[in-house]
Amino acid sequence: MKIVVIGSGLAGLTAALTLARRKQDVLLLEQNEFLGGVTSGFEKDGFRWDYGQLNLEAAGEDEPVGQVLELLGLRKLLQIVPEQRDYIFPDFEIRTPAEYGGVKWRIEYLKQLFPAEAEGLERYWADYVRFTRLMTLARRMEKGGLGAKAAFYTSLLPLISKKDWTAEQLLAHYFTDEKLKAVFVSILADFFTPPSQFQGLGVFAINAERAYERRMPAQLARNAEMLGLYAVAGGMKELIRIYEVAIKAAGVSTRYNTTVTRIVVEHNQVSGVVDQDGKLYPCDCVVASGGAKETFFNLLDPAVLPEDFSARVKDIPLMDSVFMLHLGVDEAYPEVLRSTSTYFYGSYDIEGQVKQAQEGIYHEGKAGFVVHLPSLRSPAMAPKGKYAMTIYTICPEKLKSSNWEKDKEKYAAKLLDYAEKYLPGLRKHILTQVIVTPLDLRRITHLQHHAFGGIAPLLNSWRVPHQTPVQGLWFIGAQSESGGGMNAVIPASFKVAQKIADSQRR
């Protein structure tokens, strides 16, 4: 079967490689002159940066992403190292202790900070263990077996009363202190999702304890295994390089600087794609990644889609963007930056800050920012004795009363002002600097709206299914039903590719 894969982000690369390994005839079309999209990162003056804090979740040997990379023969070619995050709030810090404190260290530490919440923290922990067991059994259930299914549904019972709760409701069940609640939902700012609109049980997923302590074992309790957070030595560009070598060896044909302008459909069946020069590429199947609205409204004749499907695509909730300051520095601030990713929060009002960003109002760093220091694990990403550093904030994709291109220098200066409160004298240590705005990211991704992590994970929101109403057209990536994040798109794209290849046996 002749298959065209549109886009070479991790979703497209995974699908293309999987299909080629299954003996399909694959053509990969990439709009840029390089593979990987934003995952590829960039270089300047001997420094190399990723576009933000790109850690791989679930990339361990027996974890979902790790298993896919293993099946594709890629994992053994990568140096994947355990990672963790540190969190700095206005009144306290949550940092991995120098001496290992066990799987429950963070909960015990929070009891010291919030003694009145000790009973609620114990109840939270009991449900965290239950949720971890539920997710472990869900992964096992995918492999089949009545025993796994029975164990899964038995484990679901203690949590079923909370299945329709929001994160706001879930945390109110355990805690009264607003600062403590913020600890458990602060990462939702990155998702542009208010706690009042996020799945309650999802709080346990975004608080995987191994993300706070890389020495922690996977085994939490019987039938309860935690997923880990990892970094790829050399940065994400190394992962893309390994993929590039693999797809070439597998026989994938790749065309760079090729933008698809139309997907051809005849009698509700895909028959080819057309590029910016009007060249037709006949095919039996198209696997599209990237923007949902761009794919379904710009590349297809509106008449081929059911009206209700188009209406739903139009209303999918997307995240907004990020403002990034990439620095080459000669000081790593080891007393402050002890992990590759350190979150600095200026506010406990996660709900209010997300809603403000959704209204087009940029906090300029006042509400918080992230410092990513990949050189801590990957010294080769900077010249000897120097360090690659990225400071970034979430931000509106479009500003309400300003312009990204016109005011980017002003915003960069303001962000440095906030960063220097924690990293004194940072400006004196900057050797090179690159500002990246939502406009830059929009150009790289070929999107009309740059969504940092794809679709926003709002409670009960509809997602674009991988298998579309058009025969032979599949949709993958961060704006598809898989949701965003490499831990989501890599396994999902692998499964979609396997499903397409399996369909040829019938």
Model-derived regions, located:
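N-terminal glycine-rich phosphate/pyrophosphate-binding loop and immediately adjacent elements
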Residues: M1-R133
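Mid-domain catalytic core of redox enzymes
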Residues: A231-V232, T259-A382
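FAD-dependent oxidoreductase catalytic-site/capping-region signature
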Residues: A367-G453
